């Protein structure tokens, strides 16, 4: 095997941490000596040992003189865990092969520099594109301080998210719905508008057996969420944030007593200032948001530039209906040339349904 093949193994290991490491990155490490893998590991959960230390601990032979393959530049600072470069140097590893550079200002090339200054051979940028893609959430969060937002919706082939009656269970099949539950596990937060709460009274949890529930964020400009709504009555068990413009302390106290966190924010174009909300969520170490809003919230999120990705689950059905809801509503763009552009699209078949996942491309002046 060569550097690329060993790095692919490290990438596969890193993937095992998805949903558990936030706001840290997913990282995998493989240690090779005399053509054989003698140790491998990954960052399993936030606050626990990093991939490099796990790989060293799993070694079946002395790692002195070996090569370590790691998907992200090793850290060189003290956080919840000690610096990984210290463990690498102490082990006698002779060569380190790295996928992605770490843009964290506490690392940002310092890990590589430290290794080289101690005589360790370092090879960089092996499968960098794949390693960067693995941690697109982390890379966005660490460079902007704001969550990576993925707008998710399910629609028919004629672009409807519900029938004209409002009925929406179910647009897609079971396989696609299971995939959505995986996304809820993988994203740190889930966000809807008060309209969704009023219409559906959703629980907004992860229904995977061993999955992690996302932090629930409700955009509710005027605090219209019913105190008996499921997101309120379960807030003592599942972290729930109400983002509002209502500064009335008595009304806020109703939700706070139930266990909700209430964020009072500025109003922008008749709704909660979503950019300000992203800043606040970033400070709460919420690195990613699965936006499951209706057409109004989705348009507002696009219009203010907070969405990085769109996940469209498309069912081979036709609903019709002049008044049937669509995924993105609001004012809309005045002309085709003004459309929000999507790039780097990926297509996946999920049973009879399709998932199209694309990045949102904003003009430089608008990008979040």
Stretches with model-predicted labels:
Residues 10, 28, 75, 115, ...:
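Residue-level signal for inorganic ion chemistry
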Residues 247, 330-368:
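Conserved histidine-centered catalytic loops in small-molecule metabolism enzymes
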Residues 303-342:
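Flexible, gly/pro- and Lys/Arg-enriched active-site loops
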Residues 140, 150-157, 161-287, 296-299, ...:
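Active-site ligand-binding patch in enzyme domains
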Residues 103-106, 129, 198, 224-226, ...:
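Short gly/pro/ser/thr-enriched loop/turn and capping motifs at secondary-structure boundaries
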Residues 31-130, 215, 241, 246, ...:
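Zn2+-dependent cytidine deaminase-like catalytic core
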Residues 2-22, 141:
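Short, basic/aromatic recognition patches
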Residues 27-35, 153-154, 356:
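Short beta-strand scaffold segments in enzyme catalytic cores
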